Every structure is written in structure tokens, then in C-alpha cells.
């Protein structure tokens, strides 16, 4: 057994893998002593994993259709990601950027990007065909990575909550990094070591903190611009009192009851929408922390 990131053989057993779906049965979680990545072993059979991913939004999220409040959350979350990217490198609204997004799902980030940067040429790779109709209506080109040669010279490659589902991350990402133009950027968002605060490990196979992400970028010969913790800190996610108030705020949100929150105006300044701001209050998606939190956001550059 070797680490999927650094190829070290210095691996330590952590715990039996927690799952419900049979695709993830009889696994264990291991940790690399060198780069500190946590990962599943054995990895799922490719055929079973492909079948799961081809209906991912049904398997993991109960379908790709979203009600008004769910849409507000995902659109608002996408706006915080775009705000992070713009804050790191700057974006020109009238520039014809060429984008490749891997695993866009129903297309929340596509919608946000194209509204802000309408001259962009936007390509996607999405294995879940239930999402294709909506993506086509947004004016994107849907590529088939197995049958269609990817174009060269992308300005941005985008992966939000994709990399944690991959069995061979270096091989997977290198194929896309090679298609980036010189000076192009790779944006990644992944959960940060979410086995620490969740009751199940599935459907994630890789569990990142900053160190393994740094090693990953080195392996790809990409220059790290920023790796940052966003969302609720782990120490709050495992605090019973804070979780009680989180559930209470979630209840008020579902009932349509507004409440005071010190971050409301900061979020609204980013998302420019009352409903989206309300949807994000419980998640700190706009806020960077110095200690491990819900998500890692990563921006790197090809030199």
C-alpha cells in the first residue's frame, strides 16, 4: 500500500470505514505518516465507482432538483468561491476567459461565473447525466472526457468537491493541469478532514488538510498561491452547544424566520441577495480561519 499523493509506504491504519452504500463496503481509513493524507483502502472497483458517480446526485443528495432555499444556498456558496478567486488573482469582467470545470453538478458555479464574466467560454465534464439538460441551458459545452479530446490553453480549471472522490488524484489532475495555459490557474475546494466531524466517511475517498494539498501541488509542478480554511472551524463543528445553536438557526431558516447575526451584512456584501445571505449564515462560507475548518480552498498557478 502506498499513499495516493506522495507514494510513501509509511502508512498507518486509523479506523474501519463508515458507510451505508455497498460501493464503500469493507474499506478502512489509513493515514500517510509523510504527507498526512488520510485515505480509503482498498479503493472501490472502478466499475462500481463509475456507476455510483454516474447517478451521484441521486445517490448522495437525493436528486439534482433543488428548491428555492437550496438554490439560494448553492448559488450563494458559489459566489463566496468566486469572491475567493477574485481576491487572490483579480478578474477582468470583459475578458474572454476559457474555463474547464470538472464535476459542476447542476451548475451553481457556472451560473455565477457566467453572470459576472459573460464573455467566458465555459466547458464542463460532468458524469451525472441528470445534470446535463440544465447545464446546456446555461450555454456551456459538455465534454466527454473518455471519447473527446480536451482542448488546450484553459485559463482556469475548476474543481469544487470533486477531488475527494478520486482514486488516483495525481494522474487525474495532471491530465487537466496539462491543458492549462502558461499563467493559468487551478482552483480546488475540498472538505477538510471531514471524518473528524461526520458520522460517515462515504462517499469520500481522500481526506485533505493543508500539508497533503501542498504536496499535491508540488507533484503537479504548480505554484501555490493560497491554501485556506473556510467555513465553520472543526472545534465548533464538534462542540455540542454550538451544534445546538446551529440546529436552532437551521430550524428558523426553514421556517422563514429572520434573526440577528453579526456576519449578515458581510455575507450580503458578497452575494448581493437577502435570501442567499440568509442561507449562508449557518456556514461561515465567506470567512477564512487560521485553524482547520469545514473546507479547504486552494488556488495555484501554472508557470
Q: Language model features by range: what are they?
A:
Residues 148, 167-178, 185-301:
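S-adenosyl-L-methionine-dependent methyltransferase catalytic module, highlighting the catalytic core
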